[in-house]
Amino acid sequence: MAVEVVQETLQQAASSSSTTVLGFSPMLTTLVGTLVAMALYEYWRRNSREYRMVANIPSPPELPILGQAHVAAGLSNAEILAVGLGYLNKYGETMKAWLGNVLLVFLTNPSDIELILSGHQHLTKAEEYRYFKPWFGDGLLISNGHHWRHHRKMIAPTFHQSILKSFVPTFVDHSKAVVARMGLEAGKSFDVHDYMSQTTVDILLSTAMGVKKLPEGNKSFEYAQAVVDMCDIIHKRQVKLLYRLDSIYKFTKLREKGDRMMNIILGMTSKVVKDRKENFQEESRAIVEEISTPVASTPASKKEGLRDDLDDIDENDVGAKRRLALLDAMVEMAKNPDIEWNEKDIMDEVNTIMFEGHDTTSAGSSFALCMMGIHKDIQAKVFAEQKAIFGDNMLRDCTFADTMEMKYLERVILETLRLYPPVPLIARRLDYDLKLASGPYTVPKGTTVIVLQYCVHRRPDIYPNPTKFDPDNFLPERMANRHYYSFIPFSAGPRSCVGRKYAMLKLKVLLSTIVRNYIVHSTDTEADFKLQADIILKLENGFNVSLEKRQYATVA
């Protein structure tokens, strides 16, 4: 089509001029040359191997040169998400799109997703993650190859269960502190995400980073807000064609704002690392645990597909183990000449874990509170479970043993993560051609494959009544009958979230403390939610709740 248009343009230009080509005006010559170049490029693109290989994959209508890149022009993050979901509903579980010459293939079938996530063939993160490079460097989220494998191996043990148990009192202290701060909002509607965001930053600083004295004033909230703004900027760069080009982006006001946000973010983490190195006393921070026999592992079954190195570390340790939390472990490794670890590695991983460990759980906890505010019957069941655990002393500190009894609260958290996964998609670059399991499609090497957790979690063939908030979706008997890649809020396989157990424990302690202190109300319904996915799934119109103080009888 594009070739025919150019031919017609050339014929019109030739017939309207009695001069030779040498007589064309410079403007006309430039126009004709540009059109010819564009036509040749489009002809080459449509005859390329990758274009022909994916010709049978459904897609929205595309424009020459641009593909579907024009679709995002002028739209907000919430509008982009809505349009994208609309296309997926129309074109089915597998869809392709072109951002210029960049091929994207979207997957929502668990059998296809298993091919991407379960093995070691397609571990390379997509090109779209390069916009995180100034922030995360070569941290776990975006690194590849030997560097990623080495860092994963060294960092995973810092999230061992014995370390997590030691964090519970700190989780409790910060949960009680945010309960007190939120008391000032009691009786009125407010955005709870602001409180969750600051609290999760403080918890990370006090636990994984080992900070003794938290930043004064609103520094934690300032950092959290800078992270939100930086995610918005990176998302714009990923979906807006012109912002993808460094040569254009560097001259924009968006880049100026990004520089300001990065100064705030790196200023905080640099200070954290500097403080920890200056005050590092390894023996006072170490946890020594004697394990005589390994923890009994789950019998091999199809659920084995979702196991990862975190399970192996927890279950197979024997003997005396000396453990350090994340930043302390990295400081010690950097001092050891026999370990491949340096100062840049420390900064890269601190920036990565600070982002992954706070923004995701602040969104998850905020969504959970909103859902309990909307579904009062479910909140009542959560409270009843808390009553059964805490008895007549409902305001005592939570323990690790208590969290193990919170089966219904855990199901509420999992159901929240099903409907509103904080990370709504995963992007990988194929290292080999891939034949999909769900249909007659072969995706070529080099393609950016996007796994859409948000859509997988709402498939009606997997979750009957998929938009209903139903914690019983995570009863063991229901889970046993589902494909094990049909629920992947923490990803799965070798590149699963290294902090998933940390996140679940933190969410249990935080939500338990809030629910035991307050009745959560919401004037919004799920129909009022305006979802936006700027890296992390959030609500454009805020996580609005109100709180009512619970009253307990005092013992005379």
Swiss-Prot record:
This is Cytochrome P450 4g1. May be involved in the metabolism of insect hormones and in the breakdown of synthetic insecticides. Signal peptide: none annotated. GO terms for biological process: cuticle hydrocarbon biosynthetic process. It comes from Drosophila melanogaster (Fruit fly). Its cofactor is heme. Its main location: endoplasmic reticulum. GO terms for molecular function: heme binding; iron ion binding; long-chain fatty aldehyde oxidative decarbonylase activity; monooxygenase activity; oxidoreductase activity, acting on paired donors, with incorporation or reduction of molecular oxygen. It is an enzyme of class 1 (oxidoreductase). Keywords: Endoplasmic reticulum, Heme, Iron, Membrane, Metal-binding, Microsome, Monooxygenase, Oxidoreductase. The keyword Metal-binding applies. GO terms for cellular component: endoplasmic reticulum membrane. Pfam families: p450. Its EC number is 1.14.-.-. SUPFAM superfamilies: Cytochrome P450 (SSF48264). InterPro entries: Cyt_P450, Cyt_P450_CS, Cyt_P450_E_grp-I, Cyt_P450_sf, Cytochrome_P450_Monoox. Belongs to the cytochrome P450 family. The keyword Metal-binding applies. Heme binds at E356, C497. It is found in: Endoplasmic reticulum membrane; Microsome membrane. It comes from the Eukaryota. The gene is Cyp4g1. It is a peripheral membrane protein.
